[in-house]
Swiss-Prot record:
Membrane topology, as annotated: Peripheral membrane protein
The protein's role, per its UniProt record: Participates in electron transfer between P700 and the cytochrome b6-f complex in photosystem I.
Protein's organism: Solanum tuberosum
Family: Belongs to the plastocyanin family.
InterPro entries associated with the record: BlueCu_1, BlueCu_1_BS, Copper_blue_Plastocyanin, Cupredoxin, Plastocyanin
Main subcellular location of this protein, as a coarse class: plastid
Cofactor needs: Cu(2+)
Name this protein carries in UniProt: Plastocyanin
PANTHER family (alphabetical): PLASTOCYANIN MAJOR ISOFORM, CHLOROPLASTIC-RELATED
One GO CC annotation: chloroplast thylakoid membrane
Amino acid sequence: LDVLLGGDDGSLAFIPGNFSVSAGEKITFKNNAGFPHNVVFDEDEIPAGVDASKISMAEEDLLNAAGETYSVTLSEKGTYTFYCAPHQGAGMVGKVTVN
């Protein structure tokens, strides 16, 4: 599943922002607009026992150019909340449910 970082209109958002995947399905986050973005999973908003640091980009790592990607595969079922560290305050937050 591909998730865009930033809307075509320049909005600071994940597109789609709320989605479901099967356990083990690869999710690819792709910078759509050329603003610096990243993908960090909220350690308090993921299934118990999952290590947020193993599925997240480091807060200081950024996808700077349009077309740059970060991929992750989630195997534990449940709901995961993630955000873009530079734009979390602007509401750039998303949620994925793993079935």
